[in-house]
Amino acid sequence: MKRAPRIFAFLPILLFVFHLLLPPPAALSQGTDSAAVEVCVLLNDLRVQRGLSELGSDPLLEQTARAYAADLRRRGVLSHVDELDRRALQRFQARGGTTVLVGELLGSGADPAAVAAAWEASAGHREVLLNPLWTHCGVGSESAGATTVWVVLFTSHRIYPLEILRCSGGYLVRGRLASDQAEEPVLISGIDPIDPFEWDSATGAFSFFISREREGIYHRLGYRSGENTLVVTNTFFPVKVAGSDCPETEAVTSDRERECR
């Protein structure tokens, strides 16, 4: 007898919003398996049918989802908490993710269409799937005998793309604001605000410089959005998430950055 798919969902608190006076769609990435691609297409179809945007793929979300699908298969459970007591957001950030909002769908079943239909039929899962804040997703799957374990992760990239690069003397943080509500980018190093040395309000492009002395400090990146309110979109320790080194020609392109050093 054909088993109905088993499903689980988790939706975290949606946004961290701080008052400034207080301290502290893309193509699917290469290497994605065909079943995961099918799930992505099915979920995007459900969103489009309800007037929502399609989700782009996020390679880091995909890696996190695949790793957790393998973990769930090994443990023989469907749980939103891993053996280290971490939920989806913590697992994503442990792999270098910086966004502050991650949702998760879990399921098991051999037929991707049946699993997607089960998520749609469940009010809690549908709430996660149809969240209008999502911009990207990542799907992981792991075969377990006659069935398959599925993990779908969602996140909201309000700053995309975002790069955190090592430079001589510090770190270059650059990206593009994607939010229509954004008035200007904001970076807080510990409790100290850092001004952008580049900011183009027309395109949303910005750059910040973080000195080497502050590489181990907790940073909050986001944007100011009316009534002196800061919406935090990304959090990170520069020393833990920095990617490749940036060329020196890019690292010293402004007097402001030289002053930061």
Where do the language-model regions lie?
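Functional surface patches built around histidine and acidic residues
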Residues: 25-261
